């Protein structure tokens, strides 16, 4: 949902939009909670409170102040990610299709012939890093830019088996117009940028597990971050290949040679970062015009020095000349070298050309060896061709996508590789490598071992759920890693499947109860965003590919009402019960009935079950930003930090009742996952709370009334307001608590309206209006370790007779308290108090 804050109402009517006017009788937190549970996508928030907006944004719900009508029109028609610290709105708005354009934030694409293959009458527009160049389009009171591009489709095309780009991009645009927006993927780049800038400033050592190409710009300015990936393809790995011949295959209709060069250089750069943790000088020989340097410059201040007879406009220092092996002495330490020398074929016959290429390959290799033979802190990437070669067995082979697969590949070596054992590799084996293997990632660092790192902050986004990881090892890492942000795939199957298919692999599935964490926040993507100064207009949908975000070691752990809080916890319930269910009271009714409380009078205001816990369990697929386990734990230890607002703390027994209701719901729905989750949450409640039951009581609290509107034959009709199992020495403690609650007890609005047979021979009158105070009293006794209440649900009633009587119904009648007392069962009254 998105909240657009206005000082005055607007005349226009918008689809899927609701107006909420700030309620001055409620505090900012209560207003935020009410807004978050509205069911429409757009909320126009009138007479807004800035504090309420802040609460929503911290909860991951985008809430933006609107000053002008064009701001409202822009934000209401599309989704966006909001940096609420810097006041920047990143639109994810594809309405630019109506201008017959596709967009890119990679400059090199604009220098290709891609426009020849677009839809008729369409053009390509460059919009800069995260749409930065579009800021001029929006003259708003907040900074605004459109981060939507078609780079995802362009890159997917490059790696696909499709050659016809026009058909491919048409299909992708149609998909985009007919399916739900993959909002997490679109906002992820904004999030990653913010995340790693924050972590690098807060932690001396940061480890990142499983980065993919979409992160290749994110880490350019963070050489200190240790990357773990799937490992490189080494020269020695070619021993598994059979010999093949030249295949020749076109991968792309438009020229992607620059993309290949960029990937080669970035792969080399990240190898250097992995070894030396600092920025090198980047030397490049050949590969002009290298327009992609402009893209790199948007993210980092890396220095480029280049040699090529053709211009390289974005180089810091360009030598418009050929580079010879004797020029290697000009290259400094703490550098990387990219050698991409290849003479244009022009009209040379094939045999002569082949001979020239092989000579240049040997020359390129010699330049690399010469460069690596002296000095320190050097990594080289060199252009090779398929031919009989001796190569170091530990050198890394690269074959990033290029316009046509022919006979070229690339080799990365460091100083140690260049001196390592060399192996003869036949031309046919290298053709086999070229024909069958595409390097899919610029990150080729070693795989991560699932072991706790003592001094590092570990980030593993979408990297550990794969079933080639041992599931128990993943759980152990999450439990034991002190500082981390780790995601795992949430189990939102209905049959409690331990693993599910995803693309061509399988992922383990997890629930929050799979982890034993006492200082971690377990939330959703949008809940996580709120902790890093971001919010989002479209919450995660239960697609089957959703992830838990587990943050360990965060200083926000105790801030229970600020982050990963209960905002939106009833939203799914509202959507269902106000549109599909038998009554809008269905949730209240079901919760009472499933706990054998059949008095449904006033059930919506006096419910005996925690609605928060119940909704968090049965609708966990729709809102798992609320960290239920943390909420339970911090209340059980009395460590919850509440910033403000009216805050109701549930008695532990209310939580147990909620689990029982959720279990009943799961059985009716045949939802095995919710069934397990409810059982495990109940077990967790019993683990962190020391709940004892007065099932063999020796004291009780009684309430005697001035008026009983029914006939009775018991000596003193009264309401048993709870039973206790205590020693006589604890009686003063009980009395002290009763005195503390005196005012609240006598303020209870107690009513009765019918009689019924509680069981054979027990005739009783119903009592309403006491449950809220009962549970508060329960909490007070619990905190003093006084056993109060039984394991079965407390059903307030007044015993009238121990014989069969006819049921009576009357108008709701108020019962006035005469006095409240504490009495020993089969003993004397030890305390009483009147108003």
Swiss-Prot record:
Signal peptide residues on this chain, from the entry's feature table: none
Reactions the enzyme catalyzes: a 5'-end diphospho-ribonucleoside in mRNA + GTP + H(+) = a 5'-end (5'-triphosphoguanosine)-ribonucleoside in mRNA + diphosphate; a 5'-end (5'-triphosphoguanosine)-ribonucleoside in mRNA + S-adenosyl-L-methionine = a 5'-end (N(7)-methyl 5'-triphosphoguanosine)-ribonucleoside in mRNA + S-adenosyl-L-homocysteine; 5'-triphosphoadenylyl-(2'->5')-adenylyl-(2'->5')-adenosine + 2 H2O = 2 AMP + ATP + 2 H(+)
Molecular functions per Gene Ontology: GTP binding; hydrolase activity; mRNA 5'-cap (guanine-N7-)-methyltransferase activity; mRNA guanylyltransferase activity; RNA binding
Name this protein carries in UniProt: Protein VP3
Subcellular location: Virion
Location of the region described as 2'-O-methyltransferase activity in the Swiss-Prot/TrEMBL record: 246-428
EC number annotated for this UniProt entry: 3.1.4.-, 2.7.7.50, 2.1.1.56
Primary location: virion
GO cellular component: viral nucleocapsid
CDD domains: capping_2-OMTase_Rotavirus (cd20757)
Positions of region (2'-5'-phosphodiesterase activity): 693-835
Assembly, per entry: Interacts with VP1. Interacts with VP2.
Region of interest: GTase/RTPase activity: 556-692
Keyword S-adenosyl-L-methionine: yes
GO biological process, one term: viral process
Function: Multifunctional enzyme involved in mRNA capping. Catalyzes the formation of the 5' cap structure on the viral plus-strand transcripts. Specifically binds to GTP and displays guanylyltransferase and methyltransferase activities. Has affinity for ssRNA but not for dsRNA. Capping activity is non-specific and caps RNAs that initiate with either a G or an A residue. Together with VP1 polymerase, forms a VP1-VP3 complex positioned near the channels situated at each of the five-fold vertices of the core. Counteracts the host innate immune response thanks to its phosphodiesterase that degrades the 5'-triphosphorylated, 2'-5' linked adenylate oligomers produced by the host cell IFN-inducible 2',5'-oligoadenylate synthetase (OAS). The host RNaseL is therefore not activated.
Record keywords, A-Z: GTP-binding, Host-virus interaction, Hydrolase, Inhibition of host innate immune response by virus, Methyltransferase, mRNA capping, mRNA processing, Multifunctional enzyme, Nucleotide-binding, Nucleotidyltransferase, RNA-binding, S-adenosyl-L-methionine, Transferase, Viral immunoevasion, Virion
Residues at the catalytic site: 718, 720, 797, 799
Record text about domains: Contains a bipartite N7-methyltransferase domain, a 2'-O-methyltransferase domain and a GTase/RTPase domain. The C-terminus contains a phosphodiesterase domain that degrades the 5'-triphosphorylated, 2'-5' linked adenylate oligomers produced by the host cell in response to IFN stimulation.
Organism: Rotavirus A (strain RVA/Human/Indonesia/69M/1980/G8P4[10]) (RV-A)
One Pfam family recorded for the sequence: Rotavirus_VP3
Residue segments, region N7-methyltransferase activity: 171-245, 429-555
